[in-house]
């Protein structure tokens, strides 16, 4: 599971990275998903993002993506100053089709998505796929600039 631990006395529910992250990244690599060649793995600094990104880095290597085309960035819980990180995303994406894989946790998603909009980054240029954003966090922001960005989640309550 996310911490790569096992126990005969523990039963996990929810998607593991091989059920959530790998199919999502396969989509980003496909023509329909934009045929990304470069990836920014952006997450909150704790076990889930670090383990998921370790798995994704190995998966991307298996698809021929080199380390120079993968950047990992971690922020503390509650982080809100995304100006520099988003500016670096713009610079990194100048060298080819880039996607952001977000494992940002909780409320930190709001300032991240707001900063993407502030700097004019659209999903048609640099798509973001999120594994840790909830519907509740997005209710408080203007989602028009987010159209085209993606989320891979087990369940969306607002979807019929």
Protein language model features and the residues they cover:
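Extracellular/periplasmic periplasmic-binding protein-like sensory domains
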Residues: 7, 116-160
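Gly/Ser-enriched beta-turn/beta-hairpin loop segments
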Residues: 3-5
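Short clusters of hydrophobic/aromatic residues that line enzyme substrate/ligand-binding pockets
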Residues: 1, 10, 149
């Amino acid at each position: 599971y996310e911490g790569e631990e096992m126990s005969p006395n523990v039963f996990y529910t929810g998607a593991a990275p091989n059920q959530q992250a790998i199919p999502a990244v396969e989509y980003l690599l496909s023509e329909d998903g934009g045929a990304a060649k470069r990836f920014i793995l952006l997450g909150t600094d704790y076990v889930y993002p670090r383990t998921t990104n370790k798995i994704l880095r190995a998966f991307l290597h298996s698809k021929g993506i080199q380390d120079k085309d993968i950047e990992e960035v971690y922020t503390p819980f509650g982080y809100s100053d995304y100006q520099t990180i988003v500016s670096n995303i713009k610079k990194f994406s100048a060298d080819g089709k880039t996607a952001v894989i977000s494992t940002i946790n909780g409320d930190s998603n709001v300032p991240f998505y707001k900063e993407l909009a502030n700097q004019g980054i659209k999903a048609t240029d640099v798509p973001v796929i999120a594994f840790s954003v909830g519907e509740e966090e997005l209710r408080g922001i203007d989602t028009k600039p987010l159209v085209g960005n993606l989320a891979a989640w087990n369940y969306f309550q607002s979807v019929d």
